[in-house]
Regions:
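Conserved MFS/SLC helix-loop-helix module at the cytosolic interface between two early adjacent transmembrane helices
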Residues: 64-103
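Extracellular/periplasmic helix-loop-helix junction of adjacent transmembrane segments
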Residues: 33-65
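Helix-loop-helix hairpin linking two adjacent transmembrane segments in secondary transporters
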Residues: 143-188, 193-194
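Cytoplasmic helix-loop-helix junction between adjacent transmembrane helices
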Residues: 108-145
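MFS 12-TM fold signature
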Residues: 86-96, 112, 174-181
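Helix-breaking motifs and short loop linkers at transmembrane-helix boundaries and internal kinks
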Residues: 45, 77, 98-104, 115, ...
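Residue-level signature of mid-helix packing/kink "hotspots" within the transmembrane helices
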Residues: 30, 59-67, 117, 151-152
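Cytosolic juxtamembrane N-terminal segment immediately preceding the first transmembrane helix
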Residues: 1-32, 42
Length: 207
């Protein structure tokens, strides 16, 4: 089996999935700044101190659950972990558009930090399962490009949604794609090459 053909096949199958998943995670994490400029602080009475607390709560959840998430992804299943996380962070993002008080918002931001904590380590583990050592640096670079690329398109989309509907609707609408994508992820993704039906036995053996 030609190794270059095998590599191209994996790149075109795996990396778009990885890119979309990480891009959606960044979208639901970063759109709070757009809402802040659109009036969420005034509507909910968020002071500068509370705004700092909300940011701290997100990263507190992110900090404490990143290692447990990585351990689960390594020992159990990246596929199952990201499937659950996609649904939960999409739900958290949409629920943000429905909150009417600061305690509820604080709880949602903390939970969002928890469920997004596993995304980066899980994606790195997933890439390591599917790419050789010589390929991983390029694959990881493509993954990280999800951040700046997402900023470009989310600025346009979020700006339009806020202008057309408002900050609440922006959160609700932007949370839905992650939930839908969770089921696409479940169908498309396998933890290891040996489980993939779209690879031949020779291609699996080459990995």
């Amino acid at each position: 089996m030609n190794s270059s053909t095998n590599a191209v096949k994996r790149w075109w199958y795996i990396m778009p999935i990885v890119f979309i998943t990480y891009s959606l995670a960044y979208l639901d994490r970063a759109n709070f700044s757009f809402a802040s400029a659109a009036g969420i602080t005034e509507d909910l009475g968020i002071t500068k101190g509370i705004s700092s607390l909300l940011g701290a709560l997100f990263f507190l959840g992110y900090f404490f659950f990143q290692i447990p998430g990585a351990i689960y992804a390594e020992r159990r299943s990246v596929r199952k972990l990201i499937f659950i996380c996609l649904i939960l962070w999409g739900a958290c993002a949409s629920l943000t558009g429905m909150v009417n008080n600061i305690p509820a918002l604080a709880a949602i931001r903390f939970i969002l930090g928890v469920v997004e904590a596993a995304v980066m380590p899980a994606m790195l583990i997933y890439i390591s399962n599917w790419f050789t050592k010589s390929e991983r640096s390029r694959a990881n670079t493509f993954l990280i490009l999800g951040n700046p690329v997402t900023v470009l398109w989310m600025s346009v989309v979020s700006g339009y949604l806020i202008q057309a509907f408002g900050w609440r609707e922006m959160f609700i609408i932007e949370g839905v794609p992650a939930i839908i994508w969770a089921f696409c992820w479940w169908v498309l993704v396998k933890d290891k090459p040996a489980q993939a039906k779209w690879l031949s036995e020779d291609e699996k053996a080459a990995l």
